[in-house]
Amino acid sequence: MTTEPRSNSQLLATIEVSGTHSQQVYNQVVNDLLRHTQVPGFRKGKAPRQLVLQQLGRERLRYLAMEKLIEDAVKTAVEKNNIPYLGNLELAGGITELLDQFHPGENFSFSVTFDVEPEVTVTAYKGLTIEYNPVTYNPATVEKLLQQHQRQHATLIPVEDRPAQWGDDVTLKLLTKDENGEVVKELSADELPLSLDEDQPFLLQEIPAAVVGMAIGEAKTVTVSVAEEAEAPRQLTAEIELLGIKVPELPPLDDAFAAEHSEFSTMAELRAYLEQNHQERAKHQDKQAKEAALIDTLIAQNPVELPKTLIRKEADVKVRTTLMQIQSQGVDLHKIMTEELYERMRQEAEPAATKEVHSRLLLKAIARQEGIEPTPEAVEERLNRYKEMLGNKTAKNLEQLRKLAHDEVQQEQTLSWLLEQNTFQPVQSDVATAEPTATAEAPTEIQTEAVAQTPSQPQKRSGKKASSAPSQE
């Protein structure tokens, strides 16, 4: 076998097979077919040889024999020469031309291309100055979170003697129509509860400002826009009628509030916990921001020819993960999934998959160059986590899971080592701030509500829910 490197981590291999071996493979294919081919009037495997050969056709036999010969020869050559074969095997030249050259009992030569693991040597990875967007703890974060929960537990008092204003909770009748005057049911509701909060975006973003100043029973028509992916925003018409106004009466943020809505007995204890929690969150997010900037820098300064096989495999993993998440929400994938949809999802996942493969190869190479190797205890600890998550499913693929645990721990340790070897410099006037989101360690009720109250689905404290209403985003 002779080999020649090609682009994108491919190898062109030319393999020659002896006439003796080509005849052996041909005979093997014929004998297998004789044993398994059913000929009318004969039991399987008992039909005369010539009759079976006549029924199958000699061209088909030669093709099947050539196909097996190529497959076996490539596998043997790869193993014998210790080639890091990945896949994506393609014949060099046309099938018809190659079949014309194949004659059992004669020497046979063919060429194939296939993906191999790239040889990666990283040169620029230490002593770099890397700009990133830092995440810093903002003391106002905790106060904002507490105010959100204070608002959630407010008592809503109906008012009738004034128009709606910012901070009110209102109930609307909403009728949204498209450009043709057709009702958009998904964006219409007989009774829609809405908080008039300037910091809480609404899907139809023009509605809250239009409601401010309206009196109960008043109606108006507003032009609204809805953004659509890859298209210009749709211009719709919204007919709104104000049905009711309620003003929130906020409970005091005192010890009683803390005791009722958290695991702590005093507000001071709750504040102290939340401050520590969000300081740790900001620190963790800042580290993640550094890691992301580091990866981008490594990729930019250390190009690697990536094999399509690895990119496709990683893209498939991302698509399957997305589909599992969709399925976990109760969606029947059999009703929506098609080959065309899967292929489109895979293509959309390829850019992220390419970056993931590139970064993983670089980190693995750096670990090899610097001798970063996780201890057996660290690998075993990570493996035990997988076992707990997967339960009885681990027995069949234990070694595969062990390798995954090793690679994951090694990558984390390599990233930590790289953070110490490089200097990180904040991008000027572009500083991110940790937002008041809850963590698993938050006090029980505070945690639950903070998780539930996302920008897309705010919790309501009173009022009726519409059967089909647009959500706040």
From Swiss-Prot:
Cellular localization per UniProt: Cytoplasm
UniProt keyword annotations, A-Z: Cell cycle, Cell division, Chaperone, Cytoplasm, Isomerase, Rotamase
Record's compositionally biased regions (Low complexity): 432-450
Composition bias type Polar residues, residue spans: 451-460
The keyword Chaperone is annotated on this UniProt entry: yes
Protein purpose: Involved in protein export. Acts as a chaperone by maintaining the newly synthesized protein in an open conformation. Functions as a peptidyl-prolyl cis-trans isomerase.
Family membership: Belongs to the FKBP-type PPIase family. Tig subfamily.
Protein name from the UniProt record: Trigger factor
Gene: tig
